[in-house]
Amino acid sequence: MYPFRGLPVRFDTFHTIFRAFQYRNYRYYYYGQSISLIGVWVQNIAMGWLVYRLTGSALLLGTIAFSLQIPSLFITPFAGVLADRWDRRKVIVVTQILSMVVAFVLAWLTLTERITVGMIISLALVNGVVLAFDTPFRQSFVPDIITRREDLSNAIALNSSLYNLARFIGPPVGGVLIALVGEGWCFFINGVSFAAVIIALASMRIKKIRRPPRFGSVFSQLREGVGYAWHFRSIRYLITLVALSSFFGLPFQALMPLFAAEILGGDSQMLGILTGALGAGALTGAFFLASRKNIRSIPGIALRASLMFALGLSVFALSAYTALSVLALVVTGFGMIVHFNSTNTLIQSIADDDKRGRVVSLYSLTFMGITPLGSLLAGAIAEYISVPFTVFAFSLVCLASAILFGKRVKTVYTSLVRKMATGP
């Protein structure tokens, strides 16, 4: 039931880290995603390389990334309302089928040499719309397949580790496939990979969840969800922390090529080293969070991780030495993934089940939707005060928000304990 059985490591350690695997439905979900996410990263690399090969334009590369992310800002909140109304598993199946269709269309256009940059941007935008709709359903679906609330943090952390593993595996595989068979077949392979998660979802046995009848329009339900999150102090504190960390903390990733080339005097290999260091820290953080048995420790972990993220980022911003930059990024990656995953766990653990989809959509909006806006602001400011000082200034905002959250963490802990005592 648990991976890595037979290795010379204490079995109870793996039992703790992979305890969400005791749920049959979660195992299916995890294995299906593992194949699909690698395919997604293969497609991401191939799409970027295809645009670069056709145009050589950094601006158009940025436009592709913007097209993938910006729909979240407008669609995700409304998708969260529907996630509280509709069957989450069925909707996820539909979004995976739509993503599969986009991949196959990309493959056909590329293999027949009909592809243009405008088509790539349009299909990236379609993919972004599907992703924006899919995210609240996907995130609020995990508690549906995890019976015990105390195992929820483990399931969310394992999902994060899977994402980071795919980020490690997918790009190198994509690079090899581009060299061997070209971008078109990379898109085709990604389309096929979606079959894994579709089959996994179809194979699950889930008890029908009775949802209370909904009255009023989507807008009124959205307003109710926003009001609920705002007046629930613990959720308001958590979402505010995530919003500030996303807007001011995450844009540094878009500026990494400039750090590699202009600050450290490197090339694409240096960028790979920096990205790998960030990913190594993130992967370590995901497994660290998965190993935590007591969910009551998560509020304190969230606070310490947000401080670690801000401090690591500030050191990286001012570093002119490769070794120090790599070390700072490992710390930053660890703090980043533990910070965002632990706040996600807390939000899902303390929110009422009938409002979880809408609350998770607000988390997704602050985590994904506003980051492109922060990146635009960071790029504009960097033109005047330099990239390092921009990132350093942004890291100080993250540090201040973490310190302020520290004054509210007891409220979050109390909400969690109360929810654990009363149940769903």
List each model region and its residues.
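Transmembrane alpha-helix termini and helix-breaking/packing motifs in multi-pass membrane transporters
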Residues: 48-55, 106-112, 169-189, 262-263, ...
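Helix-loop boundary and gating motifs at the non-cytosolic
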Residues: 10-71, 227, 231-278
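Helix-loop junctions on the cytosolic side of multi-pass membrane transporters
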Residues: 140, 144, 183, 187-217, ...
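Intrinsic disorder in cytosolic terminal tails and internal cytosolic loops
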Residues: 1-19, 408-424
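Cytoplasmic helix-loop-helix junction between adjacent transmembrane helices
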Residues: 123-165
